[in-house]
């Protein structure tokens, strides 16, 4: 479990137009379990949230107010990671989920796992692999380096198709983010974390800490922040 004293700050880009917007956002987020402080910045179009609530719950709470949100950074510098989980087999949506990791204390990291588009309803099991080599998909990621014993329950119907499910989970592990970077992250139906049961796989990469990412236009594509968000949503990256 995470102690309230092990809170972290995360920043989110959120469209806001006036003081009424900031008030509604603050009220919605303060109702989320684990949220301790909410600080909207109308001029910068950013909302800072401190607490122990997973980023996915913040994004969901903002969506309930009719607003989109983009996680811009979380935790201290060099204390966050992300993995896009792609299908480990042919067929179905190519992207099956997202993992956000935030270190909240020395050798203690929160894993916010969101799955969407996997066969189900079903129970799925997550593990961090020894290797980040995905040249042969899950088969080349090597043995399990760390396993999460509890299942990710995918019990909601996915909007991506019939007989597909969605679900999320919040896990805590005695790990430092520095040790995670470049490792594979696998989700599968096998409780023993065997490669044969792999459903989705990705590679953990470093992500920005709070206030480290103020980009509004992509230097590569020229797309704005919200154009990139639209492309990500189309690809099932929530």
From Swiss-Prot:
GO terms for molecular function: copper ion binding; superoxide dismutase copper chaperone activity. Cu cation 1 binds at residues 18, 21. CDD domains: HMA. Binds 2 copper ions per subunit. It is found in: Cytoplasm. It comes from the Eukaryota. Its cofactor is Cu(2+). One of its GO terms (biological process) is copper ion transport. Cu cation 2 binds at residues 218, 220. GO terms for cellular component: cytoplasm; cytosol; mitochondrial inner membrane; nucleus; protein folding chaperone complex; superoxide dismutase complex. Keywords: Chaperone, Copper, Cytoplasm, Disulfide bond, Metal-binding. Residues 7-70 form the HMA domain. The keyword Cytoplasm applies. Belongs to the CCS1 family. Copper chaperone for superoxide dismutase 1 (SOD1). Binds copper ions and delivers them specifically to SOD1. This is Superoxide dismutase 1 copper chaperone.
């Amino acid at each position: 479990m995470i102690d309230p004293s092990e809170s972290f700050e995360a920043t989110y880009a959120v469209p806001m137009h006036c003081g009424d917007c900031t008030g509604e956002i603050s009220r919605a987020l303060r109702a989320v379990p684990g949220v301790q402080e909410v600080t909207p910045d109308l001029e910068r179009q950013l909302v800072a949230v401190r607490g122990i609530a997973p980023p996915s719950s913040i994004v969901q709470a903002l969506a309930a107010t009719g607003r989109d949100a983009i996680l811009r950074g979380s935790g201290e510098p060099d204390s966050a990671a992300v993995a896009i989980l792609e299908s480990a087999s042919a067929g179905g949506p190519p992207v099956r989920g997202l993992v956000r990791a935030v270190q909240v204390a020395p050798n203690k990291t929160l894993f916010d796992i969101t799955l969407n588009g996997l066969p189900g309803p079903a129970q799925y099991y997550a593990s961090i692999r020894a290797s980040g080599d995905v040249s042969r998909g899950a088969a080349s990621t090597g043995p399990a380096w760390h396993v999460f014993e509890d299942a990710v329950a995918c019990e909601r119907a996915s909007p991506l198709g019939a007989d597909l499910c969605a679900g999320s989970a919040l896990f805590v592990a005695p790990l430092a983010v520095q040790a995670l970077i470049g490792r594979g992250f696998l989700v599968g139906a096998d409780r023993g974390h065997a490669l044969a049961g792999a459903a989705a796989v990705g590679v953990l990469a470093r992500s920005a800490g709070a206030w480290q990412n103020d980009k509004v236009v992509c230097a590569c594509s020229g797309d704005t922040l919200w154009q990139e968000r639209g492309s990500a949503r189309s690809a099932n990256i929530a």
